[in-house]
Amino acid sequence: MTFDDLKIQTVKDQPDEKSNGKKAKGLQFLYSPWWCLAAATLGVLCLGLVVTIMVLGMQLSQVSDLLTQEQANLTHQKKKLEGQISARQQAEEASQESENELKEMIETLARKLNEKSKEQMELHHQNLNLQETLKRVANCSAPCPQDWIWHGENCYLFSSGSFNWEKSQEKCLSLDAKLLKINSTADLDFIQQAISYSSFPFWMGLSRRNPSYPWLWEDGSPLMPHLFRVRGAVSQTYPSGTCAYIQRGAVYAENCILAAFSICQKKANLRAQ
């Protein structure tokens, strides 16, 4: 082994001072204040980033909930709107049906009105014809005046008010008539039937001054005994005289001053027949 070989080996065995110097400088850099500050800043930034991500996640969750709620509200509003639209459609359909029914009703009423108008026109024509007939009939005289009852040769009027015998006589005279006079059994039967509906007394044209005098009619003719018998106070004497009235088919005598209904009688106008 030569000297040069030992030198070379010695050189190889010596440590690399430059490399060790670099390592020492690197460790010294790691423990420098600037590196610690940078690491702390980076940690704070990472922590802030994590917090930001968490906050954003929470906000995203809230936004998602709001979107879900809003979607639910929109769905509810949609259903509500659909229900309103459906109700409106049903209302329109019902309105259309009502309108159709109303049209049919109007058409029916119009048809009935037309029919009624035709009937009214026919009735109007019939009324005109009836008026013409009444005019022709009016030119002919009736046997008895209005409200009088015709029987045989006479007309009879039954009064609606009660008066004494003398006042009743005046009433009949004002009507160009006299109080009732019965000339036959047929007349008696007719009067009895005519007043059978009533229980009131009716004055007749039969009277006498006192019991010693005969019963006389207004025209002075005497009562025929076979027609009827006068009942009641036939033997009584009254200052105003005794008069006869008919009630329930029988004839009675009474004070002429008392009030009763009356029956007027006059001749019928048979020339119109």
Swiss-Prot record:
> Where is each C-type lectin domain found?
151-265
Q: What is the effect of changing residue 193 to L?
A: Impairs binding to acetylated LDL (AcLDL)
Residues with a covalently attached lipid (S-palmitoyl cysteine): 36, 46
The impact of changing residue 155 to S is:
Abolishes sorting into the cell surface and binding to acetylated LDL (AcLDL) while increasing N-glycosylation
Membrane-protein topology: Lipid-anchor; Single-pass type II membrane protein
Give a GO molecular function annotation for the protein.
identical protein binding
Instruction: Give the start-end ranges of region Neck.
Output: 58-150
| Result, substituting residue 150 to A | Abolishes binding to acetylated LDL (AcLDL), probably due to inappropriate homodimerization
Residues on Cytoplasmic side: 1-36
On modification after translation, the UniProt record reads: The intrachain disulfide-bonds prevent N-glycosylation at some sites.
Q: Which GO terms describe its biological process?
A: blood circulation; immune system process; inflammatory response; leukocyte cell-cell adhesion; lipoprotein metabolic process; proteolysis
This protein's GO cellular component annotations are:
extracellular region; intracellular membrane-bounded organelle; membrane; membrane raft; nucleoplasm; plasma membrane; receptor complex; specific granule membrane
Protein induction: By inflammatory cytokines such as TNF, IFNG/IFN-gamma, IL6/interleukin-6 and by pathological conditions such as hyperlipidemia, hypertension and diabetes mellitus. Up-regulated in atherosclerotic lesions, by oxLDL, reactive oxygen species and fluid shear stress, suggesting that it may participate in amplification of oxLDL-induced vascular dysfunction.
Parts forming coiled coils? 64-123
Where does it mainly reside? membrane
Spell out the InterPro entries in the cross-references.
C-type_lectin-like, C-type_lectin-like/link_sf, CTDL_fold, NKR-like_CTLD, OxLDL_rcpt1-like
Please give the start and end residues of each transmembrane region: 37-57
Q: What is the effect of changing residue 229 to N?
A: Does not affect subcellular location but displays a reduced affinity for acetylated LDL (AcLDL). Abolishes binding to acetylated LDL (AcLDL)
**Which residues are listed under the site Not glycosylated?**
183
- Tissue and organ distribution: Expressed at high level in endothelial cells and vascular-rich organs such as placenta, lung, liver and brain, aortic intima, bone marrow, spinal cord and substantia nigra. Also expressed at the surface of dendritic cells. Widely expressed at intermediate and low level.
Q: Which disease is it linked to?
A: Independent association genetic studies have implicated OLR1 gene variants in myocardial infarction susceptibility.
Tell me the subunit arrangement: Homodimer; disulfide-linked. May form a hexamer composed of 3 homodimers. Interacts with HSP70.
Entry text on domains: The cytoplasmic region is required for subcellular sorting on the cell surface. The C-type lectin domain mediates the recognition and binding of oxLDL.
| Function comment | Receptor that mediates the recognition, internalization and degradation of oxidatively modified low density lipoprotein (oxLDL) by vascular endothelial cells. OxLDL is a marker of atherosclerosis that induces vascular endothelial cell activation and dysfunction, resulting in pro-inflammatory responses, pro-oxidative conditions and apoptosis.
Name under which the protein is recorded:
Oxidized low-density lipoprotein receptor 1
